[in-house]
Amino acid sequence: KGEVTVEQLMNDNSHESIAKAEEQLKLMKPNIAGWEADFGKEMMTKGKVWMNFTWSGDAVWAIEEAAEVGVELDYVVPIEGSNVWFDGWVIPKYARNVKAASYFINYMCRPDIALRNMDAIGYVSAVATPEILEAKIDSTLENYSDLSYFFGPEADSVQVDPVQYPDKEVIKRCAVIRDFTNKEDLQKVLEMWSRVKGDN
């Protein structure tokens, strides 16, 4: 059919694409130790599995935990691409106390608090202030990354942990997986996963 972008591929919910994904996942199944992300990171830290599909924040945790027991782990984004994810704070439309929720979000988005939260959970904050960038620079690292996509043009060559902040070139080969706005598409994918995992 010609070339498709990573975004088109990741958001293709056609019957044909879901069937192909199911076929490939079933072929891989004998080599899969588990499907749950938390299970994989635990197994990685113990040196019991060699590869895991995981979110970068979980990878940070696993790398740190594994290092404590002498297991060396790394985190890479496939050349073919991956998904871009981001976490943020939101207020549901049915919230009872919007004012309190707003205060909480404002508190969590203060750079000093965002940094403490990042250190506690391993995930990057949506806050992109100079204070966050300065705190994340690690001059002991050999590689420089272009983070201008996140922190602005002044961050085009900085020493940061690439697990938490991938280089701009890595981000270019990734895409956002959109939410399922069509319930039928969501149901098709859930049913496919059920068949792959053997739930039915």
PLM ranges: what are they?
Residues 13, 17, 32, 36, ...:
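Extracytoplasmic/periplasmic, Sec-exported soluble proteins
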Residues 42, 158-200:
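Conserved C-terminal helix/tail region of periplasmic/extracytoplasmic solute-binding proteins
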Residues 57-60, 80-83, 96, 109-112:
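Solvent-exposed loop/turn segments at secondary-structure junctions
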Residues 1-74:
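Ligand-binding pocket segment of bilobal, Venus flytrap-like solute-binding proteins
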Residues 23-26, 69-93:
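Periplasmic-binding protein-like
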Residues 1, 22-26, 41, 45, ...:
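Non-transmembrane alpha-helical segments in soluble domains
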Residues 92-170:
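Mature extracytoplasmic/periplasmic domains
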